């Protein structure tokens, strides 16, 4: 391994480093002025004191081979990796030509996705999971490269950082985790954050994990550490933690005031420890550069920054008319089954669970770049809790079908990451054994929904998230929950919930073939339900945003999905027998996008609407449907829009309690009858 030191490092390289460090520091010090002039950069986290390690990260990053996930303090990292001062300013003042997000993401979040300098979240540490996912793809496709992910030491207190390090060690992934340790998490000192003085030592027991400690204030020690880390990760296909000891010369950010929690002695110490001043003195002391040469470099950096500033200030602002661009990508459009229906009457009916299993296998054959993982999905004789993935690992191998740790963040986050490696990749994940246990991964769900919009259309995670959802199985509080009402509030995800086997197959096929992120809800009570079993054409497809009229009628429109579709069909039949009422039942199938056209045409015809779903009435998705009908179709209504759903309580385990809480046929019947008689 090449070793860097003050005596033997090439002079031209030293000049380059000093230029980058001087330019970076000048911009770091100038950034607050933009806010004072009302030009932007309302969030700025100064990096001064992290100079050595940030220079080294960028210098070691190899464009075309590596992926880099910098965090919000990584200004010099981005410069050192090849981004220009102008590009950094464009991000800082949120211009339309910001290469990372087009002015959509927060200032001080530097990115250039075309170089695989990734656009990351403000929730520091979440990107470690994405890094592990990219590294998994590198291993599978035998790609020569590493993934570098960077953040402060305090982020290691987050559970998802632990999950990323554990997973990368378990899978032997070439990830370099760089922890820039300045001793503080905003105002919280390290002693209140972690048990070990050196944070990386908390992870010293991990098999396959190498830990390198370095002085992040020193250019040469940092360069040697990062060079060693990259060479080790490449050669051994193992993860590395580079723990860099830094100082934070300024406040955490422009909204922080460090004099409220740091004394004068500490403030004097960190200023004296300034890495840029030390590097300058070292260059002079060892006579590698003269005072004149250093001043020439400083003058060039000053002029270059002024030019970059002038150019960036003339860049266009984002167009507010574009806010709806890149919320969701264009989906796969079925060609044969354009309306998502079929007329097959010959053949054997298939259970819901069989339809999902067979469709997964068919799509894995269709696209060899399709992968699936989750909890319990790949045991020899078992494919998940409900055997949905049974037989898949045997056919497609352990590299494409495998069980994940019981770590929901890791399951979702690595799916986001792996899909970054190549847009051809499609990832299907079982986000949790039951939807009830998915809540720890909501942060990663948010990341998946934001990516396309936040990156200004440069990246979208091609991920289908499967969740076994709902009740009616006597599961109690933690095997009966519905998540769609809460998750539907987050733009950037398609949400589908089939009620029958054929729709499960068709929607799953469309989800996997589409670009973008889809939440695929599987009502687990329907897996082996005779009522949900149907004939399923081998190539069946269902487009997003296309409802299905399950029963035609003229007196009342019932709008439903999932488990309650079957109750509603039974109720419609009962109402016809008992009162000669003609009830139309619409199975929306797709919540986002929602087929308002079909719903509206039905309500215009019947003039009465009842919305039924298993989720709670309060805060449930039906409220959005009801509001839309009330707003857009008020003049057509002969009665108030009504809703039926679960009570605003958890779901009880005793069957008596479950029946009282979840909507059933009798409750739906009474609501429908009351509405019909209105």
For the regions a language model picked out, list residue spans one by one:
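Conserved acidic/glycine
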Residues: 1-53, 59-60, 244, 249-399, ...
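Thiamine diphosphate
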Residues: 55, 115-310, 314, 379-459, ...
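Short beta-strand segments
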Residues: 70-72, 111, 125, 150-151, ...
């Amino acid at each position: 391994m090449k070793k860097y030191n003050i005596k033997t490092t090439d002079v031209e390289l030293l000049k380059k480093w000093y230029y980058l460090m001087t330019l970076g520091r000048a911009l770091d010090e100038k950034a607050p002025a933009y806010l004072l002039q009302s030009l932007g950069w309302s969030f700025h986290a100064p990096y001064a004191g992290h100079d050595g390690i940030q220079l080294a990260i960028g210098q070691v990053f190899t464009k075309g081979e590596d992926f880099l996930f910098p965090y919000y303090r990584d200004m010099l990292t981005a410069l050192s990796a090849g981004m220009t001062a102008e590009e950094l300013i464009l991000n800082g003042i949120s211009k339309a030509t910001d290469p990372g997000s087009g002015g959509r993401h927060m200032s001080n979040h530097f990115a250039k996705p075309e170089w695989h300098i990734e656009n990351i979240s403000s929730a520091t540490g979440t990107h470690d999971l994405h890094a592990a996912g990219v590294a998994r793809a590198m291993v599978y496709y035998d790609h020569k490269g590493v993934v570098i992910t960077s953040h402060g030491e305090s982020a290691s207190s987050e559970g998802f950082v632990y999950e990323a390090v554990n997973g990368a060690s378990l899978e032997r992934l070439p990830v370099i985790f760089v922890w820039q340790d300045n001793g503080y998490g905003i105002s919280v000192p390290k002693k209140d954050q972690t048990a070990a003085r050196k944070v990386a030592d908390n992870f010293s027991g991990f098999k396959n994990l190498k830990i390198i400690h370095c002085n992040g204030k020193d250019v040469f020690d940092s360069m040697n550490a990062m060079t060693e880390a990259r060479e080790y990760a490449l050669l051994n296909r193992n993860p590395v933690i580079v723990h860099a000891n830094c100082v934070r010369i300024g406040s955490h950010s422009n909204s922080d005031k460090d004099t409220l929690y740091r004394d004068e002695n500490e403030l004097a110490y960190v200023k004296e420890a300034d890495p840029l001043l030390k590097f300058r003195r070292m260059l002079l002391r060892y006579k590698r550069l003269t005072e004149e040469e250093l001043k020439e470099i400083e003058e060039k950096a000053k002029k270059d920054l002024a030019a970059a500033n002038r150019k960036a200030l003339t860049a266009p602002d984002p167009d507010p008319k574009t806010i709806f661009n890149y919320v969701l990508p264009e989906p796969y459009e079925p060609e044969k089954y354009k309306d998502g229906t079929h007329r097959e009457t010959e053949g054997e009916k298939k259970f819901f669970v069989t339809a999902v299993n067979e469709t997964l296998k068919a799509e894995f054959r269709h696209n060899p770049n399709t992968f699936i993982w989750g909890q319990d999905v790949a045991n020899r004789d078992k494919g998940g809790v409900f055997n949905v993935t049974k037989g898949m690992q045997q056919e497609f191998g352990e590299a494409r079908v495998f069980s994940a740790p019981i770590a929901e963040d890791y399951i979702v986050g690595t799916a986001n990451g792996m899909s970054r490696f190549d847009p051809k990749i499609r990832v299907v994940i079982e986000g949790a054994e039951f939807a009830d246990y998915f809540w720890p991964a909501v942060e990663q769900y948010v990341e998946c929904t934001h990516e396309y919009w936040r990156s200004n259309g440069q990246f979208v995670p091609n991920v289908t998230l499967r969740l076994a959802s709902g009740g009616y199985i006597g599961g109690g509080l933690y095997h009966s929950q519905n998540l769609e009402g809460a998750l539907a509030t987050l733009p950037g995800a398609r949400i589908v919930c089939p009620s029958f086997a054929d729709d499960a197959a068709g929607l799953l096929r469309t989800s996997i073939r589409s670009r973008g992120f889809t939440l695929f809800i599987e009502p687990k009570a329907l897996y082996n339900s005779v009522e949900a079993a149907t004939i399923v054409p081998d190539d069946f497809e269902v487009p997003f945003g296309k409802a299905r009229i399950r029963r035609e009628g003229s007196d009342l429109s019932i709008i439903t999905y999932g488990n309650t579709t079957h109750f509603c069909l039974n109720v419609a039949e009962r109402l016809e027998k008992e009162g000669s009422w003609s009830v139309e039942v619409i199975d929306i199938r797709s919540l986002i996008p929602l087929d308002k056209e079909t719903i509206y045409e039905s309500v215009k015809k019947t003039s009465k609407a009842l919305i039924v779903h298993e989720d709670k009435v309060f805060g449930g998705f039906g409220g959005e449907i009801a509001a839309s009908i009330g707003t857009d179709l008020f003049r057509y209504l002969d009665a108030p829009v009504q809703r039926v759903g679960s009570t605003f309580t958890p779901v009880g385990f005793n069957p008596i309690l479950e029946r009282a809480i979840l909507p059933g046929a009798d409750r739906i019947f009474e609501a429908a009858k009351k509405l019909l008689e209105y």
